[in-house]
Amino acid sequence: MFLTVKLLLGRRCSLKVSGQESVAMLKKLVSERLHVPEEQQHLLFRGQLLADDKRLSDYRIGPNASISVVVRPLEKPAPEDTRLPQPLWHHLGQVLAKHFGPQDTEAMLQLLRREHEECLQRISLGDLEQLARYLLTKEPLAQPTGEREPEVLSPNKEEEKEAVQ
């Protein structure tokens, strides 16, 4: 059967595999075709993360199915205790401290962090693809009011300018 394998930002390939192939073998094929190291790949089928030790048939992946590849960074995340405070949360804490007492400020920050994490957990792969597509194709912003680009003079305009002087 043929599978379509696509990366988040649009690269894709078609691979011929059997339903009895392991996910680990599929990662090896993806690595060869799309040049993404196996250890950096997360393979998703219908939003479900595929485990290396399972077979494609375990997920009922059929012919002409589409598999998404999410590339994860190699670096290991820092332990929770040694993480540097994020500037956003620091500044938000300063703003809240102007309006609330220390205990209320801390409680509000914890609530906002929890809601932020919950919102991030609800983001789908489709949402990320749509955001990436928008960010990669959006038009440049117009010049702010009051600033103009220098005027390019055509040969006719230069002659007109000289005639006026």
Swiss-Prot record:
Highest taxon above the source species: Eukaryota
Region spans: Disordered: 139-165
This protein's record includes keyword Transferase: no
Domain Ubiquitin-like residues, every copy: 1-76
Basic and acidic residues bias locations: 146-165
Cytoplasm in keyword set: yes
Organism in which the protein naturally occurs: Bos taurus
Single GO cellular component term: cytoplasm
Subcellular location: Cytoplasm
Remarks, miscellaneous: May have arisen from retrotransposition of the X-linked UBL4A gene during mammalian evolution.
Protein name, per record: Ubiquitin-like protein 4B
Sorted UniProt keywords: Cytoplasm
Gene: UBL4B
